[in-house]
Amino acid sequence: MKTIKIKEGLPISEILKKYPDLVRPCLISQNPPKIDLKNRDALAVYNKLVAREILGVELSLHPKALVPSIMSRLEFVKLTVKPHETVLDVGTGSTAICAIIAAKILGAKVYATEMVEEYYLNAHINIIQNSLQDRIQLVKSSGQIIDGVIPEDLNFDAIISTPPYLPSKVKPLGKKFGGSAEELLGGGKTGAEFSLKLIKQGAPHLKRGGRIGLIIPMKKETVAECITHAMKEEKLRVQNIRLITGNRERRIIIGKKN
């Protein structure tokens, strides 16, 4: 398995100098300056500033939603999407960050779906305030994944998602880190049910050479095995990538159509 290591984003000392009023309340240490990245509010401030400074993107974060790691999402999209492609982002979330990266950084035409009403509205705000409404078409789903949401004759160079991965019986950790059941519960005994449906429904929508890319926590080995098997069942060539961002490890799984 290929391993990629990337930096967390920006040095705390650097953003403290530029945004002292925003960063100082998040500090747990002054010398050297450190942010408590286990605190959701501090994590939100940090990633909003990373998005602004590195991507030139302004993000509005929904107070109940998961806070995405900007650098890991950037690397994920760059590994899965090529410049100027047509992309489907399934479950874009309240920030629509993967769709925004694909559209703004790679010049892609993106169809982004979201089923949670509050997240859909927040994603719309982010698309508008970054002037990407001509490149991103936001679609409200009603619990469907791809079938019934995307026209049958619409095909893509890449289908991407940060899928839910917890089994149905697991209680989400939303009170501490944010995240609705839709963001966290992948369904079934393993938590892979959402991903398996996405692969089965998405494969027929891939152009030749098209890719399905999913990113999950590195420790979710059973989910990864289920995803890999499902991609192979759809005759996709599978690549697993270990992505290390700071102290966090994620697995990117890419299935490519021949």
Q: What do the PLM-derived regions correspond to, one by one?
A:
Residues A42, Y46, Y120, T190-R250:
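Conserved Class I SAM-dependent methyltransferase catalytic core
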Residues L49-E53, I70-E85:
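Conserved alpha-helix/loop element of class I SAM-dependent methyltransferases that forms part
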Residues H62-S72, D89-G93:
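Short, glycine/charge-rich beta-strand/loop segments that flank catalytic centers
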Residues K78-L173:
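Conserved SAM/SAH cofactor-binding pocket of Class I
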Residues S161-K197:
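Mobile active-site "lid"/loop adjacent to the S-adenosyl-L-methionine
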